[in-house]
Amino acid sequence: MKRTVTKSIAIIGEGETEWFYFDSLRVACRYPFKVAPDFPQHSDINHILKLVESYLNKQYDFIVCLFDMDRLYQYPSEMQLYQRAKKEYNKKKYAGKVMFVETNPCTEFWFLLHFLPNVVCRRYESYEQLLPELQKYMPGYEKTKRYFIRTNLYKYLTENGDLERVMSNSEKLCQLCQKSPEDLKAYSEIHKVIKLLNEIKK
């Protein structure tokens, strides 16, 4: 009988939003990954890169790092460090082990894409600018631990929104943004993580 080899995956998020979303996805879909750090907190780029090295040393098969680009655009020194690290982990020796996943401005844009019927190029400078739009579809949404504990994010988004739509819209937006990155349009690469998880689960 063929033994199934479980791949080890660490998903590293900057804050509570990412932690609660991916933890709710992990439970709903029974994915065998770890969401890190263990206790959600706002982490700077240095802390995230230390976690990457820690999981590489532990021989994890895949390490996914989630980044809100609005924060990096605010702090040029962090952006420089981010770009250097991204270039380094793109090298052959890491063989696709480390994945940097961007959302501009923040993870909430990925949530919003579950509800938008068409691919629309928008520009949001910040979470605050995006929030009123998201609250049309997620009334009462707030970036607080209390809200996240009360609301199963993955379940709410897939039951009230459309997962196929968000995957498709997200991919198309990333393609459009590659053509004109200077426009700083809103986009999310989280579809890459969902694809990876689906492939590993097969």
Predicted segments with their positions:
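Short beta-strand/turn micro-motifs composed of small residues
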Residues: 13, 67
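Short glycine-enriched loops at secondary-structure junctions
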Residues: 14-18
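C-terminal accessory helical subdomains adjacent to catalytic cores in phosphodiester-
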Residues: 1-6, 19-37, 50-58, 62, ...
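Conserved beta-strand elements of the Class I
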Residues: 8-12
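Eukaryotic endosomal/vacuolar membrane-trafficking regulators centered on PX-domain-mediated PI3P pathways
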Residues: 31, 41-46
